[in-house]
């Protein structure tokens, strides 16, 4: 099979291309302009200019500057014009604009591109500056690409576009263009290794054989061109300078200058730091801490040392560093052959770090220990534990890339538990169920209590995702019994056990359980897990302020070496808090952060929860396309676990509700009514779907079903004394009373709902209850009472930025007629209700949709419509829409 290698092209720069092409398109109106594109060498500035030129017509004028031509006046202009420029820069400017205009239309946008503009000769830059000043009306955009800005470039270009390294998706696309299809985890490794530099990534893709791209734990070298540059730079350095460079390379990014100086044997390293900076190898920070110009420079320096000298340096470095993990990793790097004693020492350290919750460190240490282990059984066990720690750290992509390796090993309870763990994070409930059952069946809890406890903790997470509270508590207690309360498995189980209690409706016990867990865990990476669980509980328990305080502190997985998965849960529930308390913009920003973690980690379990909040936020704003997009994103792969399925269904149901398609609401949410016994889906405090379903039943006139459906949910919420759940259900019950014409029932129920919400910062729930109350009173004919509530609801919606519901409240107010000035309704005397119906029908809504939004029957809408036709002299909805579209004459 022949693989065609394509030129890398302009990959991953769509945003920059859109920005530049839009600026070019504005030049006929705004006049000439210049933009400076800045980026480090190798980031693709040239490719960006080439991609921009490919998108425009007529052809752009292009030039590239060179350092050797800086002293040659007009060298860049000569390329742009295709001939020698005039000797005067002002005259040259006029020629440049005329050449750019060509023979086309005078107002057609023209493009001038100069690459490496920081190396351009002064004469050419003067001519470009004069062209922009003297021909301000010309539709010309000059794009100057440079590695660094200069005063003159800054004077020419008012705006700057900075380009950074490519993201993982773009690097993966680059790989495909070079004939390589990388696993997402390997693309992540390559992106991190090269800092997203297209030049360096392409070089490695071309230089390394296919086998090197098979596993994400492979050690990638520096590209040949970087090694050559570094070797040349080191050749010009003195012995002490080189010694410091090698020490920095051996010790890694987190070493202090003092440690590097000690390893290099230097008493005063600052002269060496200056020399390395002058050679272009390092940059100096304010605290005199040298930092490699790019990460690949350090890799290249290490390669110049050779295996023997590098191993000796690592051996010495083990005595210089001051933490046990760094010491162990240096000893491993100094040991090329199996070493049972060192392997055991590293494995014990890995277990300790895992027990403390530092899973990423534990994963690396277990992998090192496996390499040093000669016994195949123990070697495989340590490799499996490395993958388990990767999953615990939230590195789903890295773990997934190693699945073929793990599956090739002999079956053990640990192996099956690890594969189940990864399946849970990927949202594969059936696979996880099968693997967990198999692991539990073959483990001997008497001989391997620690392994049995680990399997039990995976059952805990599985039960959490299935929303089975009692089952979760049972498995958590089993894990604690097997391994002990203070063991890693015990702490992990305790960190989730409180959520199981909450899902079973035992909120007081849940709070007590978390208070105890927080006291036991102290200050370690495990704190992240307990704090997140406690914040999650606070969200469910109507304590949003407490939830925000806790969740905001655990959204960064780098703190204390915590887990990406835990950070994603924290972000998802923090976004929920922000939405409920009226911070829509903050909620969308938090969702975006969660999406980014989901992309890099490969964890699918939390995505629907994030997208549910995004969907509701977009709906409030009337952003239908965005709401539909995020609802679809929530649905992707959300069929396995309830914790994925319920948010996806709620997102779709709320879109249908906003469209007044209550039949669709019932169809979407109907599967949730079939929840088995023991499921948290029957807990109104956990998932707010019951009130939406009941309200849809009422809207469809199925009052007896609505009553029967609401009763057990109301009883449950009342028994648990859960305020917001009772208020939400009371909203549906109030609508039910309204549909039956029971005005006293409407008032009593809605007043009780507002009383329950009093003192809670749940602005979204208060707005919904107030709006529904006003609708019910307006339908009951209590227009003046309804006006006060609807006005309040409108203001509440406005404070939430909910433009769609502000409009709905305004329609309700107009339909009520209280605010309509009598005797000033225009030449045709439509009632306020008729005006509202006419407006909505003219906008394209069906009778059923109008009825749902105005809380009347479709027959009532048709009655109003018949009177409207007669008064306006039209015969159809089409004629009514055409009349509405006619311009209104000013008096």
Which residues fall in each region the model found?
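Conserved adenine-nucleotide phosphate-binding loops and their immediately adjacent elements
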Residues: 1-22, 169, 221-228, 820-826
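Extended alpha-helical scaffolding segments used for macromolecular assembly and cargo binding
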Residues: 34, 51-52, 271, 279, ...
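Short secondary-structure boundary elements
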Residues: 38-43, 51, 119, 170-372, ...
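Conserved phosphate-binding/catalytic loops and adjacent sensor/switch elements of nucleotide-binding enzymes
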Residues: 43, 47-110, 119
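Alpha-helical sensor/transducer elements of the RecA-like P-loop NTPase core
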Residues: 47, 75, 123-189, 193, ...
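Helix-turn-helix DNA-binding segment
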Residues: 748, 772, 814, 819-891
